[in-house]
């Protein structure tokens, strides 16, 4: 790929860890960029740091705590009980308004300073949680906007956009990091590593995908 450096938006969860190792396969130089946005499960950043060190990639953290104060959501506000299932006619209250918009915009500025013009994010439209900023149309639109804003040629890569959680597990296995992703990542909204709490939306999706993948792999 033209320009051999990439910045991975990295939370230390299943999706972004899979993307980190995908990026290592495709780029010579990889930066992992994490964000503190007021999330209740903020220790994910320290787990992310450890994974980045194991992967041998440069790790950075951005303080974006203002994001949590902009909109009401259950990931940053301890007074709000988390939706365990997606409401029929609205976003789940785990949606953090503007999160991916801010993360990708900040990542682009950071990347430009490193001379990197590839951004990698683990958003997916297939196992859709109802988050508008995970849609392919949003990513493509923002890619154009970032290029216009900085007169550069960024490329936003979304390796997981059109695959489901079972296929994401398969990709981790293909990349040789299945056990690392299963045992050392933090996907749980309640901040419990590996298999997590088992009942938040993120854990349910992760478990469902894992069981589906293992049932196919073990045939």
UniProtKB/Swiss-Prot annotation:
It comes from the Bacteria. One of its GO terms (molecular function) is ligase activity, forming carbon-nitrogen bonds. InterPro entries: QueC, Rossmann-like_a/b/a_fold. The keyword Coiled coil does not apply. Its EC number is 6.3.4.20. It is an enzyme of class 6 (ligase). Its cofactor is Zn(2+). ATP binds at residues 10-20. Zn(2+) binds at residues 188, 197, 200, 203. It catalyses: 7-carboxy-7-deazaguanine + NH4(+) + ATP = 7-cyano-7-deazaguanine + ADP + phosphate + H2O + H(+). Binds 1 zinc ion per subunit. One of its GO terms (biological process) is queuosine biosynthetic process. The keyword ATP-binding applies. It holds the Pfam family QueC. Keywords: ATP-binding, Ligase, Metal-binding, Nucleotide-binding, Queuosine biosynthesis, Zinc. Pathway: Purine metabolism; 7-cyano-7-deazaguanine biosynthesis. Catalyzes the ATP-dependent conversion of 7-carboxy-7-deazaguanine (CDG) to 7-cyano-7-deazaguanine (preQ(0)). HAMAP family: QueC. This is 7-cyano-7-deazaguanine synthase.
């Amino acid at each position: 790929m033209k320009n051999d450096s990439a910045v991975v938006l990295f939370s230390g969860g299943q999706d972004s860890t899979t993307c980190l190792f995908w990026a290592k396969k495709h780029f010579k130089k990889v930066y992992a960029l994490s964000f503190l946005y007021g999330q209740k499960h903020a220790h994910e950043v320290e787990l992310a740091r450890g994974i980045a060190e194991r992967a041998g990639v440069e790790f950075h953290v951005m303080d974006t705590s203002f994001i949590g104060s902009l909109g009401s959501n259950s990931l940053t506000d301890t007074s709000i009980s988390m939706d365990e299932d997606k409401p029929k006619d609205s976003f789940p209250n785990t949606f953090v308004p503007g999160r991916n918009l801010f993360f990708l915009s900040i990542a682009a500025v950071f990347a430009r300073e490193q001379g990197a013009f590839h951004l990698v994010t683990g958003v997916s439209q297939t196992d859709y949680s109802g988050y508008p900023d995970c849609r392919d149309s949003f990513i493509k639109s923002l890619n154009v906007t970032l290029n216009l804003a900085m007169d550069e040629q960024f490329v936003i890569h979304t390796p997981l956009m059109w695959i489901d959680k079972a296929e994401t597990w398969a990709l981790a296995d293909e990349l040789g990091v299945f056990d690392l992703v299963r045992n050392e990542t933090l996907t749980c909204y309640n901040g419990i590593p590996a298999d997590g709490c088992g009942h938040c939306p993120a854990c349910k999706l992760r478990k469902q995908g894992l069981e589906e993948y293992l049932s196919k792999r073990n045939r």
